[in-house]
Amino acid sequence: TRPPEIGGLGFNFKWNMGWMNDTLFYTSLDPYFRSYNHDKLTFSMMYAFSENFVLPISHDEVVHGKGSLLNKMPGDYNQKFAGLRTFMGYMMTHPGKKLLFMGCEFGQFIEWDYHKQLDWMLLDYESHRKTKDYIRALNHYYLAHPALWQVEDNWDGFRWLNADDNTRSVITYYRADEKGKKSLVLCNFAASRWEDYRMGVPEAGTYRVALCSE
């Protein structure tokens, strides 16, 4: 909005509700149906640079019968955690600042209840503890790699490598910093592994896996 001195409200960022609604809808689907809704995963990049956006997973999304972020994920116990990790990898590498409500980072099962504290005892269980460790590693990676946050207002900081692989529910892209240094991202939203998956790269060279949700 405009600065307060000329009558504006002085806000610097806008919540990206379109990204939030589309992404939560997509990730809540059974993986079988995701290929038919692939646009929900990619459409946000049509307007990602039109505003200074925040990607919001706020308290409003984990109360009033909406379910916790972990419980929004379909599948069995292990598939829910895998889905949450993939969701977080996509969120942290998508252009826009991040807002994640407390409890989502370790996979709280129940909705937020302002009458009581979070279910910290869940960290005694391996899946919750490993989820917390993954989110911590993801945060450290994000902080250490300007490609993920330095250029968020134009296409210099983002390029699709393949946005159209709906049959396998995979998207690939890269983020770039002001010096052109890149971080490549592959998100697999299918319920299965893809062996020997081939993806394009922006230039020839040797690439290494820096972080994996598995």
List each model region and its residues.
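Substrate-binding cleft/loops of secretory-pathway carbohydrate-active enzymes
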Residues: 1-34, 41-48, 109-112
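Carbohydrate-interacting/catalytic domains
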Residues: 33-36, 65-66, 75-100, 104-214
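Short secondary-structure boundary/capping segments
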Residues: 2-12, 71-72, 116-119, 200-203
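Short, charge-rich amphipathic segments
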Residues: 6-28, 57-77, 123-137
